[in-house]
Amino acid sequence: MSVHSKLYEGKAKILYTTDEPEVLLADFKDDATAFNAQKRGSILGKGRINCSISSQLFQQLEASGIKTHFIDSPSPNQMRVKAVKIIPIEVVIRNIAAGSLSQQTGIELGTVLKQPLVEFYYKNDQLGDPLLTRDRLLLMELATAEQVEEITHLALQINDFLKNFWQNCGITLVDFKLEFGLDSQQQILLADEISPDTCRLWNTTEADPNRRVMDKDRFRRDLGNVEDAYQEVLQRVLTAVEIKN
Protein backbone atom coordinates (compact mmCIF):
# COMPACT_ATOMS: atom_id res chain seq x y z
CA MET A 1 0.00 0.00 0.00
CA SER A 2 1.29 3.47 -0.87
CA VAL A 3 0.13 6.70 0.75
CA HIS A 4 -1.03 9.46 -1.59
CA SER A 5 -2.13 12.75 -0.03
CA LYS A 6 -3.53 14.23 3.15
CA LEU A 7 -7.32 14.05 3.07
CA TYR A 8 -8.18 15.57 6.44
CA GLU A 9 -6.48 16.65 9.66
CA GLY A 10 -8.44 16.66 12.89
CA LYS A 11 -7.51 17.27 16.51
CA ALA A 12 -6.18 13.76 17.13
CA LYS A 13 -5.57 12.17 13.72
CA ILE A 14 -4.53 12.82 10.13
CA LEU A 15 -6.26 10.85 7.36
CA TYR A 16 -4.40 10.04 4.15
CA THR A 17 -5.66 8.58 0.89
CA THR A 18 -3.95 5.44 -0.42
CA ASP A 19 -3.63 3.59 -3.70
CA GLU A 20 -6.77 1.69 -2.68
CA PRO A 21 -9.80 3.99 -3.22
CA GLU A 22 -11.80 2.56 -0.32
CA VAL A 23 -8.90 2.42 2.15
CA LEU A 24 -7.53 5.33 4.19
CA LEU A 25 -4.54 5.57 6.52
CA ALA A 26 -5.19 7.15 9.92
CA ASP A 27 -2.11 8.62 11.61
CA PHE A 28 -2.66 9.16 15.36
CA LYS A 29 -1.09 12.33 16.79
CA ASP A 30 0.32 13.16 20.22
CA ASP A 31 -1.61 16.45 20.18
CA ALA A 32 -4.14 16.92 22.98
CA THR A 33 -7.07 19.34 23.07
CA ALA A 34 -9.89 20.04 25.50
CA PHE A 35 -12.86 22.39 25.82
CA ASN A 36 -13.46 22.43 22.07
CA ALA A 37 -9.74 23.04 21.35
CA GLN A 38 -9.53 26.06 23.68
CA LYS A 39 -6.91 24.15 25.65
CA ARG A 40 -4.07 22.61 23.69
CA GLY A 41 -1.04 20.55 24.55
CA SER A 42 0.80 17.33 23.82
CA ILE A 43 0.79 13.94 25.53
CA LEU A 44 3.99 12.01 24.86
CA GLY A 45 3.22 8.72 23.13
CA LYS A 46 -0.52 9.35 22.98
CA GLY A 47 -0.77 8.60 19.27
CA ARG A 48 0.89 5.22 19.63
CA ILE A 49 -1.09 4.32 22.76
CA ASN A 50 -4.49 5.37 21.40
CA CYS A 51 -3.86 3.61 18.10
CA SER A 52 -2.97 0.40 19.91
CA ILE A 53 -5.96 0.58 22.29
CA SER A 54 -8.35 1.38 19.44
CA SER A 55 -6.95 -1.42 17.28
CA GLN A 56 -7.42 -3.96 20.05
CA LEU A 57 -10.95 -2.79 20.88
CA PHE A 58 -12.07 -2.64 17.25
CA GLN A 59 -10.87 -6.22 16.76
CA GLN A 60 -12.71 -7.34 19.89
CA LEU A 61 -15.89 -5.60 18.71
CA GLU A 62 -15.58 -7.14 15.24
CA ALA A 63 -15.29 -10.57 16.84
CA SER A 64 -18.51 -9.87 18.77
CA GLY A 65 -20.38 -8.98 15.56
CA ILE A 66 -20.08 -5.17 15.51
CA LYS A 67 -18.94 -3.87 12.11
CA THR A 68 -16.19 -1.23 12.27
CA HIS A 69 -13.97 0.66 9.83
CA PHE A 70 -10.84 -1.08 11.16
CA ILE A 71 -8.67 -3.09 8.75
CA ASP A 72 -5.28 -3.40 10.43
CA SER A 73 -2.46 -1.44 12.06
CA PRO A 74 0.67 -1.34 9.87
CA SER A 75 2.71 0.65 12.40
CA PRO A 76 2.40 1.63 16.09
CA ASN A 77 0.63 4.94 15.48
CA GLN A 78 -1.12 4.14 12.19
CA MET A 79 -4.32 2.32 11.32
CA ARG A 80 -5.68 1.29 7.94
CA VAL A 81 -9.41 1.92 7.84
CA LYS A 82 -12.28 1.58 5.41
CA ALA A 83 -13.23 4.89 3.83
CA VAL A 84 -16.57 6.06 5.20
CA LYS A 85 -18.67 9.19 5.01
CA ILE A 86 -18.84 10.30 8.62
CA ILE A 87 -22.33 11.00 9.94
CA PRO A 88 -21.87 14.43 11.63
CA ILE A 89 -23.17 13.26 14.99
CA GLU A 90 -21.22 12.48 18.14
CA VAL A 91 -23.03 9.74 20.03
CA VAL A 92 -22.40 9.84 23.78
CA ILE A 93 -23.37 6.91 26.00
CA ARG A 94 -23.45 7.55 29.74
CA ASN A 95 -23.51 4.91 32.48
CA ILE A 96 -22.52 7.12 35.42
CA ALA A 97 -23.20 10.82 35.94
CA ALA A 98 -20.12 12.94 35.23
CA GLY A 99 -18.99 15.90 33.12
CA SER A 100 -21.69 17.96 31.44
CA LEU A 101 -24.49 15.66 32.63
CA SER A 102 -23.73 16.50 36.26
CA GLN A 103 -23.07 20.16 35.48
CA GLN A 104 -26.28 20.69 33.52
CA THR A 105 -28.71 18.56 35.56
CA GLY A 106 -27.40 18.69 39.12
CA ILE A 107 -27.19 14.88 39.25
CA GLU A 108 -24.37 14.14 41.68
CA LEU A 109 -21.04 13.11 40.19
CA GLY A 110 -20.67 9.33 40.36
CA THR A 111 -24.38 8.52 40.42
CA VAL A 112 -24.97 5.22 38.62
CA LEU A 113 -27.74 5.73 36.06
CA LYS A 114 -30.71 3.34 36.12
CA GLN A 115 -30.16 2.70 32.42
CA PRO A 116 -27.62 3.91 29.85
CA LEU A 117 -28.32 7.39 28.50
CA VAL A 118 -27.74 7.89 24.76
CA GLU A 119 -27.19 11.49 23.64
CA PHE A 120 -26.58 13.06 20.23
CA TYR A 121 -24.33 16.07 19.65
CA TYR A 122 -23.93 17.97 16.40
CA LYS A 123 -20.33 17.51 15.24
CA ASN A 124 -19.63 21.18 14.56
CA ASP A 125 -16.80 23.04 16.31
CA GLN A 126 -18.07 26.48 15.28
CA LEU A 127 -21.35 25.85 17.09
CA GLY A 128 -19.66 24.18 20.05
CA ASP A 129 -20.96 20.65 19.32
CA PRO A 130 -24.47 21.34 20.70
CA LEU A 131 -26.70 18.68 22.22
CA LEU A 132 -29.47 17.69 19.80
CA THR A 133 -32.91 16.25 20.31
CA ARG A 134 -33.91 13.46 17.95
CA ASP A 135 -36.39 15.78 16.22
CA ARG A 136 -33.74 18.46 15.64
CA LEU A 137 -31.38 15.84 14.28
CA LEU A 138 -34.03 14.74 11.78
CA LEU A 139 -34.99 18.33 10.99
CA MET A 140 -31.36 19.08 10.08
CA GLU A 141 -31.26 15.90 7.96
CA LEU A 142 -28.06 14.73 9.64
CA ALA A 143 -29.39 11.17 9.46
CA THR A 144 -32.62 9.38 8.62
CA ALA A 145 -35.00 8.04 11.26
CA GLU A 146 -33.93 4.50 10.36
CA GLN A 147 -30.25 5.42 10.72
CA VAL A 148 -30.87 7.04 14.11
CA GLU A 149 -32.64 3.90 15.29
CA GLU A 150 -29.80 1.68 14.05
CA ILE A 151 -27.12 3.93 15.55
CA THR A 152 -28.90 3.92 18.92
CA HIS A 153 -29.16 0.14 18.85
CA LEU A 154 -25.48 -0.22 17.91
CA ALA A 155 -24.41 2.27 20.58
CA LEU A 156 -26.18 0.28 23.30
CA GLN A 157 -24.70 -2.99 21.98
CA ILE A 158 -21.23 -1.46 22.01
CA ASN A 159 -21.82 -0.13 25.51
CA ASP A 160 -22.77 -3.58 26.80
CA PHE A 161 -19.63 -5.08 25.29
CA LEU A 162 -17.26 -2.32 26.43
CA LYS A 163 -18.63 -2.15 29.97
CA ASN A 164 -17.84 -5.82 30.40
CA PHE A 165 -14.45 -5.54 28.68
CA TRP A 166 -13.34 -2.56 30.78
CA GLN A 167 -14.62 -4.27 33.92
CA ASN A 168 -12.27 -7.17 33.14
CA CYS A 169 -9.49 -4.56 32.99
CA GLY A 170 -10.36 -3.26 36.47
CA ILE A 171 -11.75 -0.10 34.88
CA THR A 172 -15.22 1.45 35.15
CA LEU A 173 -16.66 2.82 31.91
CA VAL A 174 -18.33 6.06 33.00
CA ASP A 175 -19.23 7.42 29.57
CA PHE A 176 -17.81 7.55 26.06
CA LYS A 177 -18.19 9.05 22.59
CA LEU A 178 -18.73 7.18 19.34
CA GLU A 179 -18.79 8.21 15.70
CA PHE A 180 -20.33 6.28 12.83
CA GLY A 181 -19.94 6.46 9.06
CA LEU A 182 -21.45 5.08 5.87
CA ASP A 183 -19.37 2.89 3.58
CA SER A 184 -19.78 2.64 -0.20
CA GLN A 185 -22.68 0.21 0.32
CA GLN A 186 -24.42 2.68 2.68
CA GLN A 187 -23.75 0.32 5.57
CA ILE A 188 -23.28 1.94 8.99
CA LEU A 189 -19.83 1.24 10.47
CA LEU A 190 -18.34 2.22 13.81
CA ALA A 191 -15.56 4.71 12.99
CA ASP A 192 -13.09 7.12 14.64
CA GLU A 193 -11.42 5.59 17.74
CA ILE A 194 -12.06 4.15 21.20
CA SER A 195 -9.41 5.32 23.64
CA PRO A 196 -8.81 7.37 26.81
CA ASP A 197 -9.39 10.40 24.57
CA THR A 198 -12.98 9.34 23.88
CA CYS A 199 -13.87 7.37 27.03
CA ARG A 200 -14.20 8.50 30.63
CA LEU A 201 -12.45 5.71 32.56
CA TRP A 202 -12.11 5.29 36.32
CA ASN A 203 -9.83 2.87 38.14
CA THR A 204 -12.36 0.54 39.77
CA THR A 205 -10.37 -0.01 42.98
CA GLU A 206 -9.48 3.67 43.55
CA ALA A 207 -11.91 5.78 45.62
CA ASP A 208 -10.10 9.12 45.37
CA PRO A 209 -11.93 11.23 42.73
CA ASN A 210 -8.68 12.50 41.23
CA ARG A 211 -6.43 9.45 41.47
CA ARG A 212 -9.07 7.17 39.90
CA VAL A 213 -9.09 9.14 36.62
CA MET A 214 -7.45 7.22 33.74
CA ASP A 215 -8.52 9.32 30.72
CA LYS A 216 -8.21 12.75 29.11
CA ASP A 217 -9.75 14.36 32.20
CA ARG A 218 -6.22 14.20 33.61
CA PHE A 219 -5.26 16.66 30.86
CA ARG A 220 -8.48 18.71 31.04
CA ARG A 221 -8.23 19.18 34.80
CA ASP A 222 -4.43 19.40 35.09
CA LEU A 223 -4.25 16.31 37.29
CA GLY A 224 -0.80 15.31 36.00
CA ASN A 225 0.63 11.87 35.11
CA VAL A 226 -1.36 11.82 31.87
CA GLU A 227 1.14 9.66 29.98
CA ASP A 228 1.32 7.17 32.86
CA ALA A 229 -2.47 6.83 32.98
CA TYR A 230 -2.76 6.23 29.23
CA GLN A 231 0.07 3.68 29.33
CA GLU A 232 -1.61 1.88 32.25
CA VAL A 233 -4.87 1.65 30.29
CA LEU A 234 -3.02 0.17 27.31
CA GLN A 235 -1.26 -2.40 29.48
CA ARG A 236 -4.55 -3.48 31.05
CA VAL A 237 -6.18 -3.78 27.62
CA LEU A 238 -3.34 -5.93 26.29
CA THR A 239 -3.47 -8.14 29.38
CA ALA A 240 -7.26 -8.57 29.11
CA VAL A 241 -7.01 -9.46 25.41
CA GLU A 242 -4.24 -11.98 26.10
CA ILE A 243 -6.31 -13.65 28.83
CA LYS A 244 -9.41 -13.68 26.63
CA ASN A 245 -7.53 -15.27 23.73
Swiss-Prot record:
Organism: Trichormus variabilis (strain ATCC 29413 / PCC 7937) (Anabaena variabilis)
CDD domains assigned to the protein according to its UniProt record, in alphabetical order: SAICAR_synt_PurC
Alphabetic keyword roster: ATP-binding, Ligase, Nucleotide-binding, Purine biosynthesis
Residue spans crossing the bilayer: none
GO molecular function: ATP binding; phosphoribosylaminoimidazolesuccinocarboxamide synthase activity
Reaction it catalyzes: 5-amino-1-(5-phospho-D-ribosyl)imidazole-4-carboxylate + L-aspartate + ATP = (2S)-2-[5-amino-1-(5-phospho-beta-D-ribosyl)imidazole-4-carboxamido]succinate + ADP + phosphate + 2 H(+)
PANTHER family for the chain: MULTIFUNCTIONAL PROTEIN ADE2 (PTHR43599), SI:DKEY-6E2.2 (PTHR43599:SF3)
Similarity comment: family membership: Belongs to the SAICAR synthetase family.
SUPFAM superfamilies membership: SAICAR synthase-like
Organism placement in taxonomy: Bacteria, Bacillati, Cyanobacteriota, Cyanophyceae, Nostocales
Pathway(s) served: Purine metabolism; IMP biosynthesis via de novo pathway; 5-amino-1-(5-phospho-D-ribosyl)imidazole-4-carboxamide from 5-amino-1-(5-phospho-D-ribosyl)imidazole-4-carboxylate: step 1/2
GO biological process, one term: cobalamin biosynthetic process
EC number: 6.3.2.6
Database matches in Pfam families: SAICAR_synt
Protein name in UniProt: Phosphoribosylaminoimidazole-succinocarboxamide synthase
